[in-house]
Regions:
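Cell-envelope and extracellular/periplasmic
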Residues: 1-123
Length: 123
């Protein structure tokens, strides 16, 4: 999920370096670069998105796992999207029927969110 909850100061505190995120897009305002791993300081999706379910899921997970285990997330999401956005046989047609704001979000993933996810996962 993209995340739209307001990020508050406590959401950026006491973060475990074992919970990591890979930037799926360049985030100029945060200095993050696509394909690079970072401590999972929100926002995890794109530079202007909010808090996601992955934020506290990942934090809770690392608290329960042995110290030597790290958790990483790659968030490639567009709010309000159907699963068709991630079906490479349907992506182009699905995007073509959406509002301009939606198309602009998809452009950040080169109009291929699933492909971007797979590219990042191979890094």
């Amino acid at each position: 999920m993209e995340g739209n909850a307001k990020i508050e100061p406590q959401d950026r505190e006491n973060l475990s370096p074992r919970f990591r995120m890979m930037a799926a897009v360049d985030m100029n305002t945060t200095g993050r670069k696509k394909g690079k791993w970072y401590v999972a300081v929100p926002p995890l999706c794109r530079a202007w998105t909010g808090l996601t379910p992955a934020d506290y899921f990942g934090r809770s997970l690392v608290e329960q796992l042995p110290e030597e285990i790290k958790v990483g997330v790659i968030n490639v999401a567009v709010g309000g999207a159907s699963i068709d956005l991630y079906d490479e046989d349907k992506t182009t047609e699905y995007i073509s029927k959406q509002a301009d704001w939606f198309k602009n979000f998809c452009k950040e993933y080169d109009d291929a969110p699933m492909r971007r996810l797979m590219e990042c996962a191979k890094e």
